[in-house]
From Swiss-Prot:
GO terms for biological process: aspartyl-tRNA aminoacylation. Homodimer. It catalyses: tRNA(Asx) + L-aspartate + ATP = L-aspartyl-tRNA(Asx) + AMP + diphosphate. This is Aspartate--tRNA(Asp/Asn) ligase. Its EC number is 6.1.1.23. It comes from Beijerinckia indica subsp. indica (strain ATCC 9039 / DSM 1715 / NCIMB 8712). Keywords: Aminoacyl-tRNA synthetase, ATP-binding, Cytoplasm, Ligase, Nucleotide-binding, Protein biosynthesis. Aspartyl-tRNA synthetase with relaxed tRNA specificity since it is able to aspartylate not only its cognate tRNA(Asp) but also tRNA(Asn). Reaction proceeds in two steps: L-aspartate is first activated by ATP to form Asp-AMP and then transferred to the acceptor end of tRNA(Asp/Asn). The record marks H33, G83 as: Important for tRNA non-discrimination.
Length: 597
């Protein structure tokens, strides 16, 4: 017999009744029923009920056992007595009649229980993550993570991609976030950087003659944490392809992403053909470039209606005269809601920094809905009818209005759309709604610095190429850039690359970077462009966010092995920690710490 086990705690069934077995695992739960001890023994594979009678020679030791002790149990497999079976457990029709117990590892008093679903403070969970990971839900999430990554790898290889590993120690580059820097001992005063993404390396692979690249890539960004972004590091399915168009990327990647959601989505419907939504349309209709399409509400622009001479609502007209816009957010069936519903939404809008949300309630008949509410009196019947048509309203609906400069109005309208959909129970559940967002702007205006900045990835190909860069207003240029959104989350982003050196230099020049800056910051890739660069493009999908959606959780810590807390601290390992004087001396570093506040 094996030293520790002949079966796992998830193996045994009625077919093994009357066999001798040996199991090893953790004491998940111990119960005393009329002097008979029941031990639920748990390992990675499942739980098996073990029974210790008072006349068993193992009973004296069994009485001393406590939760999470690691034990080896020998015994006889037998069917559970009629009426005591547990069909919820794979092993629920058998139990082990215990003949011998060996303690393999005692456990100190637990800072948090493993049994049960009681939530504990995050600092306790992270400090004792090894205990937290024993809990069933988190344990399953981590196993799901491995399975999803295996599936993504398999699907990428089926699409003809080859897996590569790019360097972890690299040069610092301005990719939108702070770098994690690594000081060089050999080269005093110089630093490596951990890659924010393998962007340059994967493009260099295409220039090196490889055709279809992917990797499950660790990425490092020194940025503030939030629920859908872990501090420090994250993983992405990184992809690049040569001699392709945007449509080729879509054709290759849509089956991979869709397939993963179908395989691990517990039967929830998944969008079969991802619709393509231009960025400008997404911002207008949904107030977001990562729209949640489970919500049926569609925002409409009604600026021209409020700008009419016969409309006397000056609060909006004054904003419109300064270049503002008015967005209408429909609220299907909201006419029957109490006044508190509308007041609560108005208070919420004010808490978001807005002046509020104007609204109109439509009553009467579908043929002739009549508007009521605080601003209805300022709107002639003709304007009300136009709003009904444009916002796709009917009697019994209401409509809210967001008025501000376009960027702020879109953001408020988008947030209001989500809130209204949730409050009214309009959004679908149990479904994965995916879409492509396309035609992103190449550049955006930085109001603080009064400069033109890259809108997203600086390496994207402008639509129209070099000619567009030379002749168009930069703020009108669109890029061959695209995202995948799912249920309100951005889960992938990519683009066709600007592979011509003269176009790349011009693109950076518009954003305020001279050729010398391009050479300094992207020297390796810029040199490679001089020696025959193929047309290429790709994308990166957020592995962590995909798994978070599949697991049905709201926080990335629930699908990550050893995450940091909100302060970017690893409470288990004690990182970050102080370096020794010897370590600092070897790295030629002297500390200059800020004064304590």
């Amino acid at each position: 017999m094996h030293r520790y086990r002949t079966h796992t705690c998830g193996d045994l069934r009625e077919a093994q009744a009357d066999e001798t077995t040996r199991l090893s695992g953790w004491c998940h739960r111990i119960r005393d029923h009329g002097g008979v001890l029941f031990i639920d023994l748990r390992d990675h594979y499942g739980i098996t009920q073990c029974v210790v009678d008072p006349d068993s020679k193992a009973f004296p030791l069994a009485e001393k056992l406590r939760s999470e002790w690691v034990v080896r149990i020998d015994g006889l497999v037998r069917k559970r007595p009629s009426g005591t079976e547990n069909p919820e457990m794979p092993t629920g029709f058998i139990e082990i009649y215990v003949t011998e117990i060996e303690v393999l590892g005692a456990a100190a008093e637990l800072p948090m229980p493993v049994f049960g679903d009681i939530d504990y403070p995050e600092d306790i969970r992270l400090k004792y993550r090894f205990l937290d990971l024993r809990r069933e839900k988190l344990h399953k999430n981590i196993m799901l993570r491995g399975q999803v990554i295996d599936s993504l790898r398999r699907r990428m290889k089926e699409q003809g991609f080859f897996e590569f590993q790019t360097p972890i120690l690299t040069a610092s580059s301005p990719e939108g976030a702070r770098d994690f820097l690594v000081p060089s001992r050999i080269h005093a005063g110089k630093f490596y950087a951990l890659p924010q993404a393998p962007q340059q390396y994967k493009q260099l692979l295409m220039m090196a003659g490889f055709d279809r690249y992917f990797q499950i890539a660790p990425c490092f960004r020194d940025e503030d944490p939030r629920a859908d972004r872990l501090p420090g590091e994250f993983y992405q399915l990184d992809v690049e392809m040569s001699f392709i168009t945007q449509e080729d990327v879509f054709a290759a990647m849509e089956p991979v992403i869709r397939g993963a959601f179908e395989e691990f989505g517990n039967g929830q419907p998944v969008t079969q053909t991802f619709p393509r939504i231009p960025y400008a349309e997404a911002m207008l209709k949904y107030g977001s470039d990562k729209p949640d399409l489970r919500n049926p509400l569609v925002i409409a622009d009604v600026t021209d209606l409020f700008a009419r001479d016969d409309v006397s609502f000056n609060a909006f007209k004054n904003v419109i005269k300064k270049g503002g816009v008015v967005r209408a957010i429909p609220a299907t069936g909201a006419a029957s809601q109490p006044r508190s519903f509308f007041d609560k939404l108005n208070d919420w809008a004010k808490s978001e920094g807005a002046a509020g949300l104007g609204y109109v309630i439509f009553e009467g008949s579908d043929e002739a809905p009549v508007g009521k509410g605080p601003i209805a009196k300022f709107l002639p019947a003709e304007v009300q009818a136009a709003i009904v048509t444009r916002a796709d309203l009917k009697a019994g609906d209401a409509v809210f209005f967001a008025c501000d400069i376009e960027e702020k109005a879109a953001k408020l309208a988008g947030a209001a759309r989500l809130r209204i959909g949730h409050e009214l129970g309009l959004s679908k559940t149990g479904v994965f709604e995916l879409c492509w967002i396309v035609d992103f702007p190449m550049y955006e205006w930085n109001e603080d610095d009064k400069t033109v900045d890259f809108s997203h990835n600086p390496f994207s190909m402008p639509q129209g190429g070099l000619e567009a860069l030379q002749t168009q207003d930069p703020l009108t240029i669109k890029a061959f850039q695209y995202d995948i959104a799912c249920n309100g989350y951005e889960i992938a982003s990519g683009g066709i690359r600007n592979h011509r050196p003269e176009a790349m230099v011009k693109a950076f020049e518009i954003a305020g970077y001279g050729e010398e800056t391009v050479v300094e910051r992207f020297g390796g890739m810029y040199r490679a462009f001089q020696y025959g660069a193929p047309p290429h493009g790709g994308m990166a999908a957020g592995v962590d966010r995909i798994i978070m959606l599949l697991a049905g959780v709201q926080n990335l810590r629930e699908i990550s092995l050893f995450p940091m807390n909100q302060k970017a601290e690893d409470l288990l390992m004690g990182a970050p920690s102080e370096a020794t004087t010897k370590q600092l001396r070897e790295l030629h570093i002297r500390l200059n710490l800020p004064e304590p506040k």
